[in-house]
Amino acid sequence: MFELNRKSTEMSMLSKAGGGTAYDFSDIRPIGSPIRNGENGKSDGIIPFIKGYDSWILASKQGSLRRGAVAIYLNAEHEEFPDFLEIREPKGEVQRQCHNIHQGAIFTDDFMNKVVDKNGKERELWLATLKKRVKTGEPYTMFIDNANKVVPEWWKTHNLKIHHSNLCSEIFLPTDENHSLVCCLSSLNLAKYDEWKDTNTVFLATLFLDAVISEFLEKAKDIKGIEDTVRFAEKSRALGLGTLGWHSYLQSKMIPFHGLEARSLTRLIFGDIRKKAEEATMYMGSKYGSPLWCEGTGRRNLTLLAVAPNRSSSKLAGGVSQGVEPLAGNVYVDDDAKGLHIRRNPYLENLLISKGKNLPEIWDQISEDKGSVQNIRSLTKEEKEVFLTFKEINQLELVRQAAVRQEYLDQGQSINLAFFQDAPAKWINQVHVEAWKLGLKALYYLRSESNLRADSKMQRDLYSECLACEG
């Protein structure tokens, strides 16, 4: 009980400072479990505690800008997992509804093997999870064994183990009762990749993030309530350098998002970023020393790379595509603090200009088709492939590309999926299972027309992310 309250205080303090938070409730007794062999009665289960966190996060604000945010993770084998799936729904007992938290579901290899073998209970829980993702966008799906089986050997020296991810499902760092993860993130603009690929940009960005860790330690050391995060940062100095503008870069080269060419570029670019980031951490290790969890490695940092969603940062970078995901449409309405604005894909616009087809009726057709160019006769088949929208892209190809990228990321990546409303359940299941088989550590939101409509009715931001994940 004390630890649950202590962590809720930590959550509030971190949210107030602009950080997203996440906690794993898998070790809490399920409802009806005896407390101290029944001497103290029976447990009320996890939902009342999650409800407490739900209320606390509502009262916590990230500066003066917006309320705080937290993700609660739960292993699918926990007895209360079916109830956990329902807590964000506006139905049932009010005291068991939690509309302000985000959900993450944890799946082991053993569980997933039983899903593939179509075993009863596991298969039912998995399908219930997918149905909820189609309806609400959540829970995030975390494949915990994919995360832990690729950690370096030197993690094991300190018994470091990953238990859960973060609010945006790209962070994979070790935690325990005395250590809470810290996200230290920034992103490289891949839309400008050709301008910085032969410079020391990656090297300097890695040094910059390490300096941010130093500043955090200096400012946070005397703040009550976040001692576990300070302790974690001191021992790990973990970083998460990522990217944004990936789809914009591909379109600038007239390369389709799906296919071998995009996968080859993924390997080339992220392999290069990893190599240069490794050089930077070894340089800092030799110059400034290694933290406790990196002793004997010569490194300055426990981790180096993680790809965040970067929704707001992508706007600030000139309206490039978010993170590593495809553009949702080639024309869309952007709702920001200054009002509503119609945004057009600049690469498509340049192509239409070159063809003498940058006409109002063309853009009206694209708008009518929800951002799609597939009915624009003046574009060739190859050009239409380049400007496929998120939902038009084969989601299996998106997962395969992410698997290539994951080889170079020591943490993870925020990977959203998008399906048309009439997508067969079998296809949605296949894509999710393939993500696990290919080694992805997690999947973020599932975007569909149904969950966008449902969330609009509840007046809640479906794609919440913390300030750190906008780095």
Feature annotation, model-predicted:
Residues L4-K7, A238-P256, W427-L440:
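Hydrophobic/aromatic-rich, well-ordered segments within soluble, folded domains that form packed cores
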Residues I28, G38-G52, G63-L160, T243-P291, ...:
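Conserved, charged catalytic cores of large soluble enzymes
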Residues I162-H163, C168-T175, L217-K219, L305-G471:
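Catalytic alpha/beta core of large soluble enzyme barrels
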Residues A17-R29, A69-I72, P256-G259, I415, ...:
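Glycine-rich phosphate/pyrophosphate-binding loops
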Residues M11, S60, A128-K131, F172, ...:
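Generic recognition of flexible, low-complexity loop/linker segments
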Residues L204-V230, E234, K253-N310, K381-K384, ...:
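Internal maturation/activation junctions in enzymes
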Residues M1-G38, I46-F49, S60, R133-A233, ...:
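Function-dense linear segments that define catalytic or interfacial modules
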Residues M1, G45-F49, Y73-E77, L160-H164, ...:
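Secondary-structure capping and boundary motifs in well-ordered enzyme cores
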